[in-house]
Amino acid sequence: MDLLVNKYQPSEIQDIVGNEATMELVSLMIESRDMPHLLFTGPPGTGKTTCAKILARRLLGNKEGLLELNASDERGIDTVRTTIKSFAQRRVKDCEFKIIILDEADSMTTTAQQAMRRVMEIHSSECRFILICNVFTKIFEPIQSRCAILRFDRIEQSVILKRLKEISEGEGIRITAEALDLVVELSDGDMRQSLNILQACINSPGTVDQDYIIKIIGLPSPKRIEKVLQRLLKREVEEALEMFDEIWEEKFDPLDLINSFFRAAKNMESYELLKVIGLANLRISEGVNSRLQFYGMFWDILDMGSKRL
């Protein structure tokens, strides 16, 4: 059985969901049969690599003129000096220009990027680069200046939801509307992640609900998280800490845990809670993820409540 991410991988530019303005620019390149050096940047699961491969295939129609590399595996200067440079110098019959797709280019060493800039300068007439990265600020500035930068934003939730409905119906996956909404929320604009979660639902013996999603993903129960917040807002501190400590001992990832608190606050429609939890989320996402960070957040919630009294 094919994985959903493979089965539903777009084969044409118009099949890629989201980022319509960027897709229009890429379509114009296909129509003109030409392209500059390109830098695709944006979060995971937004179609960068798929778009690059479709663009290369439509322009070349010839695999001999295409080199695909993942820079996280081949990130050093030797790759530039041997693989990339030799490919750029090679002649390919009936090929106006060659294309090098370099995925995860932001993982390349500075020395490797400096060497690659030189290759881009010398061979720009017969070889074009498509660099793909999550964080474009990690790309050497002289390389950025030689590329047209196309930004891929997180895919809108409504777009992901529509696509998941189509796929779940086509695959015969019985899933509640609430569960689909949760899948969309958990994927955070990442189409690939949403398909991976849906993949885990295929063998469900019954209708997939929110509890099933939470179980397979390994997240804390939203009801338990909401109860912790409710206890804090009622200033029942001892009970709230006891409930939280039980959740903490289950060894959830701190980032998953703080995101669960954030979702609970959204459901409770409390702007003040969202603000406090959002600040804690920022600290934890930067790697400061001890239990004390959560205790500090709880203190801020209590302080927030006392100011309202």
From Swiss-Prot:
GO terms for biological process: DNA repair; DNA strand elongation involved in DNA replication. It is found in: Nucleus. One of its GO terms (cellular component) is DNA replication factor C complex. ATP binds at V5, V17, G42, P43, P44, G45, T46, G47, K48, T49, T50, N134, R192. Keywords: ATP-binding, Cell cycle, DNA replication, DNA-binding, Nucleotide-binding, Nucleus. SUPFAM superfamilies: P-loop containing nucleoside triphosphate hydrolases, post-AAA+ oligomerization domain-like. This is Replication factor C subunit 4. The lineage of its organism: Eukaryota, Fungi, Fungi incertae sedis, Microsporidia, Unikaryonidae. The gene is RFC4.
